[in-house]
Amino acid sequence: SRGLGDVYKRQMKDNYINGIKLPVKVESNEEYISKSKQMLDHFAYQMDKPAFAMRKGLAESVKSICAILKNVLDLAEKGDDDSLDKIDKKLKSTIKEYFYDDFGVSELDKCYAFRGLAPFAELHTPGKEDIYKKMNNRDFELFRARIPQKGETFTMLHEMVHRPYNSQSDYGNCRFSNRKYPCLYLGTTSYVCSRECRWDEEKQGLYVSCFKPNKEGKKLKILNLVCTQGLINGLASYRDLQDKMLKVFPLVIVTSFSINNSSKKKLEYSISQSLMRIIINDTDIQGVAYLSCQGDDELQYPHGVNLAIPVYDICEKKSTANYVIILP
C-alpha cells in the first residue's frame, strides 16, 4: 500500500512533457501532414498523465485544440479559398485565449522571445536579480540578411527591407506573409539570418543590416510563439502559466516544420499565414516572434529567434520608422 502511494505521489508530480523535438524537417507536404498529426496525437496522449488530468478542463482543452488543428491540416491540404476561411475560424478558436495573456502578447522590449524571463518578476529565481536587471537593460539588436545575385550589390535601405509589393506572387513562399501584406523578417543574430537565407558561405556573398528598435519600436505588440518543451517543463511550478503554454504548444508544433523541397505549394506555411491573417484582421498585435525552423533544436534559443512584422504601408519610411537601421 505504501509503495502504491509513493507511485501515485510521483505520478501527481510528473507534470512534464517529453518526446517533442522541434523544429522538424521533412521531405514533402504529405510527410508534413502525417508527421504533424502524429506529434499532435503524442502530445494529446500525454495529457492523460494524472498530474494533467486532475487539472480541471486542461486535458479536454488540449485534446480539443489538437483535434481542431488536425482538421485544419486537412483543410490546408485541400487548399481552396473556402478552406482558407474555415482554417481562419478554427484557428482563431484555439489561440484567442493566448492573445490576452501578458506572457503571450507583450511589448517587443518585454517579450520572452528577446528578454527571456527578465521582464516577468514573478518567475525569477531568487538571488539572481542582478542578472535579470542586466537582461532587461541590455539594448538588443535585430538583423536582416540578403544574398546577392552575381554582380549585385546592396547599399541602399530599400534593398534590405521587406519584399516589394510587386512581388506578391512570391508571398506564399514566406512563412507568415499573405497576398495582401508582406512581412519584414528579422532575426536576433546575423547567424540565424544566414540560415534562413540558406547561405552557402563558400559560393555566395551575404549582406547584413542591423535593425535597432527605437523608442516606438520597443512598444510594438508582439505575439510570442517561442514556446519550447524545455520552457513548459521549466514552468512546472507555475500551474496557470504552464496550462496556457500547454494550450498554445500544439500551434507551435504545427508551425515548426520545414519542408526540404522546391515545391511552390508550402503547406507548412498555411497555418502561420492563417495566424497572421487573424492578427491583422482581429487584433492590435503587430508582429510574431518564433524560433527559426532552420535550427537544429530548441537550444538555438535565444540566438535563433525570428520576428515577422506585417507591413501595412507601401511607404518605405513608414515601414521602417520603428528602427535605427545600419546599412549593409
Regions found by a protein language model. Give the residues of each.
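Active-site and NAD+-binding cores of ADP-ribose-processing enzymes
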Residues: 9-136, 144-149, 155-167, 173-176, ...
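Short active-site loop/helix that positions an aromatic residue
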Residues: 190-202
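A short, exposed loop/beta-hairpin motif centered on an aromatic-Gly-Thr core
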Residues: 181-186
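Short, small-residue-biased leader/transition segments that mark boundaries at the very start
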Residues: 1-8
